[in-house]
Structure formats: structure tokens, C-alpha cells
Amino acid sequence: MLSPKRTRFRKQHRGRLKGISYRGNRICFGRYALQALEPTWITSRQIEAGRRAMTRNIRRGGKIWVRIFPDKPVTLRPTETRMGSGKGSPEYWVAVVKPGRILYEMSGVAENIARRAISIAASKMPIKTQFIISG
């Protein structure tokens, strides 16, 4: 699972998911990509599940780039705990994704194989996505 090696602060505010992604919205490394169409938090488990699904599907040959990184800690309170007494402890990490953001890129495979692999990865994501081709 992806997570930062160390952070400056243990806990973060939740923040808001306003607007569209101005950074990371173009294909940089590969030929095919999966692009987010909705705003959400994507957990490190979901990122890893999508990556594994794509890797298994393209087998040998082809290269995959993961373009998002979970750098935001999400805190949870213990179950059956009364309100108050501070914020909960960090439980997992999420990547903040806005519409237009590229999630995965791929190259070195035929388009039909890439389309199939990326659609399987898209089914692991909690949002609507689209398959795009560079050029």
C-alpha cells in the first residue's frame, strides 16, 4: 500500500473538493490513460487494487504509471466512543482527486488490451472515469 514515508504533521483538515484538476490532467508518460470525471478521495487500497488488476491483465510487456499518490491522512475515532476528547488517530491514506485528473497511464500494449485492462481498473474506482489516448 502506498503512503508517505514521513509527514510534517500527523493530522490534516478534511478540506473541500472544489473545481477541476489543473495539474496532472494530461498524459505525460504512456499512450493510454484513465481519467477521473468526478471529485473524490481515493484510498491507497483502491489505488493498489486498480494497479494489480491492470498488471495482471497486461501480463508481460507494457508499462504502467500510477499518477496519484495518497498523501492525506484520514482519521477515525474508535467505535462506541463519546464525542469530544480530541480528533481520532490516522487510520488510512487517501489521494484527493478532482475531475480531469489522470489516475493511471499505460504504454507498450495494443489498444484493445489497454482498453480492457483500464476498464477493469476503472471498476475498482469509486467514481466515473474515462479511457483516453494521447495524441
Swiss-Prot record:
**InterPro entries recorded:** Ribosomal_uL16, Ribosomal_uL16_bact-type, Ribosomal_uL16_CS, Ribosomal_uL16_dom, Ribosomal_uL16_sf
The yes or no answer to whether the keyword Kinase is present is no
Q: Where in the cell is it found?
A: Plastid, Chloroplast
Tell me which UniProt keywords the record has, alphabetically.
Chloroplast, Plastid, Ribonucleoprotein, Ribosomal protein
Q: Record keywords: Acetylation included?
A: no
Recorded GO CC terms: chloroplast; mitochondrial large ribosomal subunit
Gene Ontology molecular function terms on file: rRNA binding; structural constituent of ribosome
Can you supply a Gene Ontology BP term from the record?
Answer: mitochondrial translation
Under the subunit heading, UniProt states:
Part of the 50S ribosomal subunit.
Tell me which HAMAP family the record gives.
Ribosomal_uL16
Which PANTHER family does the UniProt record give?
Answer: 50S/60S RIBOSOMAL PROTEIN L16, LARGE RIBOSOMAL SUBUNIT PROTEIN UL16M
- What's this protein's family per the entry? Belongs to the universal ribosomal protein uL16 family.
Q: What is this protein called?
A: Large ribosomal subunit protein uL16c
Species source reads Carica papaya (Papaya)
Tell me what gene encodes this: rpl16
